[in-house]
Design a protein with these regions (language model features):
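Structural signature of FAD isoalloxazine-binding scaffolds in flavoprotein oxidoreductases
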Residues: 91-108, 121-123
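Short, structured patches in soluble enzyme cores that scaffold and shape functional sites
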Residues: 100-102, 116, 123-127, 131-133, ...
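A generic local secondary-structure boundary/capping motif
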Residues: 4, 63-65, 85-88, 112-121, ...
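A mid-sequence, solvent-exposed acidic-amphipathic segment
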Residues: 180-186
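Flexible glycine-rich active-site/ligand-binding loops centered on an Asp-His dyad
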Residues: 90, 97-101, 142-169, 175-176
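N-terminal non-catalytic cap/leader segment that marks the start of a structured domain
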Residues: 1-95
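Conserved small/polar residues in nucleotide/adenosyl-binding loops
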Residues: 190-197
Length: 197
């Protein structure tokens, strides 16, 4: 199951991609993909829906961010060995956790606004996860039970601001438009093979 948001900025409609790659309008079932609606109950409701009966959306429409208004946008720094080596940084013994502001979030093809004074704007492809139910002190064995789905993230950074202006990652990663996401959420419950395999 692939979920996305289609339409001009601020007017996106929630959609599901059918087996023939058509965008089907979910507006009659759900108002948007946000923290209130991205949960396992919603997935069950969508699973029971006759997708072919839903109206098609224009396939040439803008693809928006696949999630709107998330409560948090958290990243794990240097989580890929090759990237750490590329940056001449040691592999951390403990995860480096940072936040990106939710104003970073844009659609996957929307323009990125390079900040004034930037001399080293860079990007990394990451995998984002949608947590579909409350999770506190979850064991490694049960972690995937909380993951509703995943999507692509373009983690944009201004490296000079990040490394040379107080070593605060937010300075380099927090600019508006520095977090394009999507084009869609792939729901884990309906992937084959299972991510557990």
């Amino acid at each position: 199951m692939k979920l996305c948001r289609i339409g001009s900025v601020g007017e996106e409609k929630p959609a599901i991609i059918d087996s023939e790659n058509n965008y089907r309008d979910l507006s009659s079932i759900i108002n948007d993909f946000n923290p209130d609606t991205l949960n396992f109950d919603t997935l069950e409701k969508l699973k029971k829906t006759d997708i072919s009966s839903l109206p098609k959306l224009d396939s040439n429409s803008r693809i928006g961010a696949c999630v709107t208004n998330p409560a948090k946008f958290i990243g794990i720094g240097l989580n890929f060995k090759d990237h750490a080596e590329e940056q001449n940084l040691p592999i951390p013994k403990e995860p480096i956790i940072f936040s990106k502001f939710t104003s970073c979030i844009t659609g996957p093809n929307d323009p990125i606004i390079v900040p004034k004074g930037s001399n080293h704007t860079d990007w990394e492809v990451e995998i984002g996860f949608v947590i579909g139910k409350k999770a506190i002190n979850v064991s490694i064995e049960n972690a995937l039970d909380h993951v509703l789905g995943f999507f692509l993230v373009n983690d944009v950074s201004e490296r000079d601001f990040q490394k040379n202006r107080g070593l605060t990652w937010d300075k380099g990663k927090g600019f508006d438009t520095f977090g394009p996401i999507g084009p869609f959420i792939v729901c884990l419950l309906y992937t084959s093979p299972s991510p557990r395999d």
